[in-house]
Amino acid sequence: MLTAAEVAELADVVREWIADDPDPVTAAELEALLDAQDWDELESRFTGLLQFGTAGLRGALAGGPARMNRAVVIRAAKGLVDFLREAVGTGRAPRLVIGFDARHNSEVFARDTAAVATAAGLETFLLPRPLPTPVLAFAVRHLEADGGVMVTASHNPPQDNGYKVYLDGGAQLIGPADREIEAAIAAAPGAAAIARTPVTPDARAVATRSAYLDRLTKRFAGTARGPLRIALTPMHGVGGEIVMDALVRAGFADVHVVDEQFAPDPDFPTVSSPNPEEPGATEALLKLAADVDADVAVALDPDADRCAI
């Protein structure tokens, strides 16, 4: 139970955050919590910052510094940009690639990140559409970038989103770089004070999907050994189209998909959890596999960086 003095202090902090919030939706959400005097919920949202680690950021979509929202993402982008500029030095502008999946606000967060990086003088590549996480990792190497950001919460529940950071070579972030970026984020000013310049995908970013498929084709073309019937679900995520293209290029033409789970849907309406490792998540896939007498059944997670076979 907060004291009256603690409540007054918390209310002041919340109002300061609202004044700095670039998103009218989360600002109004916090105003409503103030009006309702929901101090427990506000204390939860304003106790510390959303923790940044080797997996980047991940949390529930909501207003406040301990949740995933535009204000938090803009400050995270500023911290990452400052880290990259320090790491690369003064000889050239760092390169940053940004990708996103089909979750709620993923494209918004990606565009905010690209805008912060561009305003800071980075050479910025924004991928043009929702794509799998492995495409982003590939793009970091393909475009010879110094870092990458993938906006995704992988197989988390639909109310979550996240922010994965990759370094040069397309490798996911490891220590001690995570602590250095975390410190840079903590030192960043409020979102309103961080410059942003809108950016649109250029031709090299647009061509990345094709380059990724070309690399897969070169690596796996001709690996099909006779007919193989495949059942596939992308689990409402972003892997469906590109995996289908890759399978066909590799010579696997007899592919059957779970129709109701093929198109990206940020609410994952047909599963209780979009994690293919969870019991029950693959029921529709296994039924399809039995119906078509498939030789193998493949379930992707929503950002298509893992699968169950």
Q: Which residues are covered by each model-predicted region?
A:
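N-terminal small/polar loop signature for handling phosphorylated ligands or for N-terminal nucleophile
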Residues: 97-160, 251-309
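N-terminal glycine-rich phosphate/adenylate-binding segment common to multiple enzyme folds
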Residues: 21, 25-29, 33-34, 138-146, ...
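Rossmann-fold NAD(P)-dependent oxidoreductase module
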Residues: 83, 116, 139, 219, ...
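Gly/Ser/Thr-enriched, mixed-charge loops and adjacent short helices
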Residues: 17-21, 25, 41-46, 50, ...
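An N-terminal, well-structured beta->alpha segment
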Residues: 2-113, 203-228, 238
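Non-catalytic terminal/interface segments that mediate subunit docking, oligomerization
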Residues: 52, 62, 67-85, 238, ...
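Short, glycine-/Ser/Thr-/acidic-enriched flexible segments
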Residues: 57-59, 64, 103, 131-132, ...
